[in-house]
């Protein structure tokens, strides 16, 4: 579907952001993100596009001239959250002349014209495949004085060929692919984001290098199924390569200044030993693996079209722990999939007990229109789902605490975060992530080289363990100031210029050089 397609010769398409038309201040914007890490990264691209078009980020507490929602469609409450928020904004918009509201992302791709039917005060609706159209659509909506809805069925531009304004001075997302070739019966994502298309390795590494050149020390490689990377390169000159992801991980190990590399999410059916070997043998690959289980019942896995069974899943974990003994393993689990029996659920509990996950993202199944599972007749009653969910949560919480107790007395290295703890102001603590991804709240006293900033690196001794975090109150053992910390202190975040090839386009030249190092950077 392509509703109201763009026309390059449309007089509204070339208008700048409204605030600049008569010498007034630039219009302000805010991007609100619902959903997964892929959406967070897409929102960085949206921010980059808007700033390139002349918008500026709204100040905290200010009412922006433009609000962009980047939405999720995975669970039912995502719909409710969006439309509830849009309802609250109706009066705000009426009291703020010229304000615009745009809705994009997976829910917009799914609902299309339904968005403006439910919320007629929305100005622009765009999908997952045409985020580059947003500035044009905003100008056209103002020019035509009506909502502009543009949803396209295939990717117009690979997101990496768009500019990005990053959210963090010290950690960055880098997409390795878009789309997914799996057909899980509960998941709507493939129908919204399309078939998998993989970036060239050189383009990915160029983007990683651009981030590192600006002080970023941790990068997370993103894809709907990262370990399938290499099955369908967007560059037709590159041949299919089943070992491409392990090669990419090893190449990241050669980037000087890149201290931590993570990736998400893999798929158990395609997770291979060469990736585990690359993790074990590449020092900057973090000892952390997110491996979605979804269910411990082989019967349910078959109904989900998850092309692995519990024995294979546990065998992967065994191999990871044999080669990376200190690895932290996290997972996703769905409770109450249609037809799930008590026996099926018990199988999930059994796998969770054996797997000893560091943490688990547990979800109560919610039917998504357009997915096969939504039409299954044997939906599990809500009350039963809730009871099972609570049992699973109790089991996983016990395991989390037992595993975290093992860290008491150990020394861990932390990349200091901005925020991270709801009680940090009251407890006078700061927060950071260990190399294995565990969240640690620490007291910033001891061996400190000036103020500790987000992006700096500290080592601490763990003194207490809770189910979902560790505490280190014995003081800081070492503190290393970093360029990322320098940038955090002055509110500077990286920007990345367009990198790589567009879809079906020939190769382009070298990426635009990264911005120069700020004068106050320590260079370490």
UniProtKB/Swiss-Prot annotation:
Biased composition (Basic and acidic residues): 1-12
Matches recorded under SUPFAM superfamilies: Radical SAM enzymes
Required cofactor(s): [4Fe-4S] cluster
Keyword presence, RNA-binding: no
One MF term in the entry's GO annotations: 4 iron, 4 sulfur cluster binding
EC annotation from Swiss-Prot or TrEMBL: 2.8.4.3
GO cellular component, one term: cytosol
Residues annotated for [4Fe-4S] cluster 2 binding in this entry: 180, 184, 187
Catalytic reaction annotation: N(6)-dimethylallyladenosine(37) in tRNA + (sulfur carrier)-SH + AH2 + 2 S-adenosyl-L-methionine = 2-methylsulfanyl-N(6)-dimethylallyladenosine(37) in tRNA + (sulfur carrier)-H + 5'-deoxyadenosine + L-methionine + A + S-adenosyl-L-homocysteine + 2 H(+)
Keywords per UniProt: 4Fe-4S, Cytoplasm, Iron, Iron-sulfur, Metal-binding, S-adenosyl-L-methionine, Transferase, tRNA processing
Protein name, as recorded: tRNA-2-methylthio-N(6)-dimethylallyladenosine synthase
Native organism: Corynebacterium efficiens (strain DSM 44549 / YS-314 / AJ 12310 / JCM 11189 / NBRC 100395)
